[in-house]
């Protein structure tokens, strides 16, 4: 035990703060994230696959370019480019124009420039037009954030317990939840604490907080830790970077210190949406539990299943997992279960539902004991989150430390306007910005995996140290990229939205949105990677002309914080020329990777065939791996999600797989019922259905003609059959001499509107039927068809009809 550590609960807050500051000066704080163990496995992975890393390919290309003459890279510290960047606040001036400026290479901070020697003006007119323009649209994210705060501090009415339970059950069935009835009162929860000593934590955890450099709890930690220690269910929401991981980790570790140690069991399950976030939470818990005997294991996809199975059989106290892999182990691994689970934690719950894990979450909740503590944490609260809360939590306490869409005050947000003429040079704009202004500790968010990989190659060939993080990499490569960026061995981390949630890397100065995020919520989580825990940070977003609506929504929420950054033409032109010269090397590297991928796939197939021959009996003797949903159910769920997305439904309109199955069975029963009808009724129903479809088509065509929109559409089989029958009827009339001549046809066209399509369909339908089926009211040669005398029941009826 550290002799310098002092436990002095009776001392003043100032003395404790001074002591902790002195301890911090004596010993550097540890980093909570450790991914170094995966770096060695990446080298072994490449050796096993007989492939080379992208960095080796880039170094080979650079060595070849040196022999053949290397393209000139723009210097970021040239004297002629001083004072090239100009930035102004949106609230400074009105009625200006955004004009391309130049980049400031002397300071990383954005300042206002008063030098107008080159005739460059800085303007935010587009931002103001979007704020005050016609037809403004309110952002859904703001409305959701405001709705999520309603009923936050209402107290639950006391009454008969049985009646309350019945009301809750009916609410759950109907999907309507009254916050005042469902959530417990948050009275007594305090969002302020001077030190961790006030939170009733044990000495080992206080030592761990001291080693990590934690001196004062954040608001969500101060409110969550005391309530979690009492075993209450919690629904927590706070801004990104507010310390949610430590908010649920510390009370969990405190409770596990007093567990029955004679019986090992899995007592805590933590679910995260991504593998990187799971690895980060696992590393954080190991750092906080370094002075205890609590064991924790990581269960995510992309890593060895056998190693994870052995770890689960050893019954660790805490399991940090992604939903799919933990369900796989619970169903297919022996001696692995959640019978003794005491705490279930859902981290980044909104992201879990966005990625389609709702069915997996419900299955895990079903497998967990009912008498458990459940904690749910999310940066934003949506309707789907509220539905999940009603299913998994029991009288939870809702804690909202900050507004869900509030960004840190230390964050400086900027916009780089990409004109339509410069969209082809967007990579050059990014390269110029990174060469001159933002040179280290930068996360660049790309929209696609292909774009992120291409940017990695461009940065490498330009002599800039960068790492990539996206779904095309193996899990070891993804974690190695995080470790390299954390150790500052690379200056840039080029990632997709995989890194947009929960990833907390100390010291990130800048976030660049190379591709504009899909909505304001995604923007919030991206820029939340910087300016964390009170530090300063910059967020730069590239906005094209097609992203004006999103820029308007961001500007409305950001207010005067949003600034306009101007990038000069000269450095962009130099970088565009450089990228053009590097295109041959980029295509060569991509071709090498493609060939390696094809070769590796062929080797895998050959190895698989050899193993099937050599170990045939062992392979076929293994039990088949099962899943909680069948292939049919998974297809139905995917189809329902696709239909709801294509129809543009809201979150409340998304149907489940069971509902989709019910609709399919209902349609099947209707078809069977129609099949058993008499032929006459069945044909009548079919004719009515065709008429309704024709009427709807006519209405759509009329609307399109009114709106002036004409689209070329192919003809369906029904239309072809209809036109064919119509032409055959017309030719038959002409053959019989009853058809109209050409002059009559032209006269009819000029005289007025002809019969509608519905009338023509009725006429065709009646002509196909016999006279008997057309009904008694049909006339032939203006004479009613007479019935025979034998068809009447009595002579009096025959006389009356006579």
UniProtKB/Swiss-Prot annotation:
Coiled-coil boundaries: 90-122, 149-174, 572-616, 671-712
Motif (Q motif): 194-222
Listed Polar residues bias regions: 644-659
Enzyme Commission number(s): 3.6.4.13
Location of the region described as Disordered in the Swiss-Prot/TrEMBL record: 1-179, 639-802
Catalytic reaction(s) noted: ATP + H2O = ADP + phosphate + H(+)
Family annotation (SMART domains): DEXDc, HELICc
Domain Helicase C-terminal: 429-573
Record keywords, A-Z: ATP-binding, Coiled coil, Helicase, Hydrolase, Nucleotide-binding, RNA-binding
Database matches in PROSITE patterns: DEAD_ATP_HELICASE, HELICASE_ATP_BIND_1, HELICASE_CTER, Q_MOTIF
Helicase ATP-binding domain: residues covered: 225-399
Acidic residues composition bias: residue spans: 76-131, 138-169, 691-702
Record-linked SUPFAM superfamilies: P-loop containing nucleoside triphosphate hydrolases
Pfam entry (one): DEAD
Bias type Basic residues, positions: 666-684, 776-802
Enzyme class: hydrolase
GO CC aspect terms: nucleolus
Record motif DEAD box, residues: 347-350
Binding, ATP: 238-245
Molecular function (Gene Ontology), one example: ATP binding
Notes on the domains: The Q motif is unique to and characteristic of the DEAD box family of RNA helicases and controls ATP binding and hydrolysis.
Protein family per UniProt: Belongs to the DEAD box helicase family. DDX27/DRS1 subfamily.
Protein name: DEAD-box ATP-dependent RNA helicase 28
UniProt organism field: Oryza sativa subsp. japonica (Rice)
């Amino acid at each position: 035990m550290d002799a310098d550590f002092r436990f002095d609960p009776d001392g003043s807050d100032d003395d404790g703060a001074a002591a902790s500051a002195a301890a911090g000066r004596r010993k550097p704080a540890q980093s909570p994230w450790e991914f170094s163990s995966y770096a060695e496995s990446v080298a072994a992975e490449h050796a096993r696959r007989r492939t080379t890393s992208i960095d080796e390919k880039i170094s080979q290309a650079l060595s070849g370019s040196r022999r053949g003459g290397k393209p000139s890279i723009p210097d970021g510290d040239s004297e002629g480019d001083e004072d090239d960047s100009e930035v102004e606040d949106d609230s400074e001036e009105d009625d200006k124009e955004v004009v391309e400026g130049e980049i400031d290479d002397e300071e990383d901070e954005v300042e206002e420039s008063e030098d107008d020697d080159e005739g460059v003006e800085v303007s935010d007119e587009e931002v103001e037009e979007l704020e005050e323009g016609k037809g403004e649209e309110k952002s859904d994210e703001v409305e959701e954030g405001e709705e999520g705060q309603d009923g936050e501090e209402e107290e639950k009415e006391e009454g008969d317990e049985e009646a309350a339970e019945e009301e809750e059950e009916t609410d759950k069935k109907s999907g309507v939840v009254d916050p005042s009835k469902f959530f417990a009162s948050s009275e007594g929860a305090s969002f302020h604490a001077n030190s961790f000593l006030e939170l009733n934590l044990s000495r080992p955890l206080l030592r761990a907080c001291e080693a990590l450099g934690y001196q004062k709890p954040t608001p969500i930690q101060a409110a969550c830790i005391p309530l979690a220690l009492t075993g209450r269910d919690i629904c927590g929401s706070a801004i990104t970077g507010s310390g949610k991981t430590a908010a649920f980790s510390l009370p969990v570790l405190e409770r596990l210190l007093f567990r029955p140690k004679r019986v090992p069991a899995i007592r805590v399950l933590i679910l995260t949406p991504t593998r990187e976030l799971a690895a980060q939470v696992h590393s954080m818990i190991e750092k906080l539990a370094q002075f205890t005997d609590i064991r924790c294991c990581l269960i995510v996809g992309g890593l060895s299943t056998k190693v994870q199975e052995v770890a689960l059989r050893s019954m660790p106290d805490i399991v940090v997992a992604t939903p799919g892999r933990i369900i796989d182990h619970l169903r297919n691994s022996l001696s692995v279960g959640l019978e003794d689970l005491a705490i279930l934690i859902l981290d980044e719950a909104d992201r879990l539902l966005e990625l389609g894990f709702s069915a997996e979450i419900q299955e895990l909740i079903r497998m967990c004991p009912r008498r458990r503590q459940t904690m749910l944490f999310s940066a934003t609260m949506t309707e789907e989150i509220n539905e999940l809360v009603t299913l998994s939590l029991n009288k939870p306490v809702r804690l909202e430390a900050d507004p869900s869409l509030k960004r840190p005050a230390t964050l400086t947000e900027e916009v780089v306007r990409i004109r339509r003429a410069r969209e082809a040079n967007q990579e050059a704009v990014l390269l110029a910005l990174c060469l001159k202004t933002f040179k280290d500790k930068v996360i660049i968010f790309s929209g696609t995996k292909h774009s992120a990989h291409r940017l990695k190659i461009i940065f490498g060939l330009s002599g800039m140290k960068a790492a990539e993080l996206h779904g095309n990499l193996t899990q070891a490569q993804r974690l190695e990229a995080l470790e390299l960026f954390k150790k500052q061995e690379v200056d840039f981390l080029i990632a997709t939205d995989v890194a947009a949630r929960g990833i907390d890397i100390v010291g990130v100065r800048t976030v660049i949105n190379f591709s504009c995020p899909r909505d304001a919520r995604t923007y919030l989580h991206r820029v939340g990677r910087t300016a964390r825990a009170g530090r300063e940070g910059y967020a730069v977003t590239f906005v094209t002309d097609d992203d004006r609506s999103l820029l308007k929504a961001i500007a409305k929420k950001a207010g005067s914080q949003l600034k306009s950054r101007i990038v000069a033409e000269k450095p962009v032109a130099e970088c565009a020329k450089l990228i053009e010269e590097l295109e041959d090397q980029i295509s060569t590297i991509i071709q090498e990777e493609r060939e390696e991928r094809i070769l590796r796939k062929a080797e895998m197939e050959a190895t698989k065939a050899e193993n099937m021959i050599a170990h045939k009996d062992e392979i076929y003797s293994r039990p088949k791996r099962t899943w909680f949903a069948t292939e049919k159910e998974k297809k139905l769920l995917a189809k329902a999600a696709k239909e709801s997305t294509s129809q543009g439904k809201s979150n409340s309109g998304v149907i489940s797989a069971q509902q989709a199955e019910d609709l399919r069975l209902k349609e099947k029963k209707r078809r069977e019922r129609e099949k058993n009808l008499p032929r006459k009724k069945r044909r009548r129903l079919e004719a009515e259905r065709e008429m309704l479809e024709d009427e709807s088509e006519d209405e759509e065509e009329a609307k399109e003609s009114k709106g002036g929109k004409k689209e070329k559409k192919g003809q369906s089989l029904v239309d072809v059959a209809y036109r064919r029958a119509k032409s055959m009827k017309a030719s038959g009339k002409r053959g019989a001499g009853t058809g109209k001549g050409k002059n009559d046809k032209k006269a009819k066209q000029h005289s007025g509107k002809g019969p509608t399509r519905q009338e023509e369909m009725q006429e065709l339908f009646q002509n196909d039927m016999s006279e008997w089926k057309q009904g008694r009211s049909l006339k032939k040669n203006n004479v009613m068809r007479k019935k025979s005398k034998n068809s009447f029941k009595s002579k009096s009826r025959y006389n009356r009809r006579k």
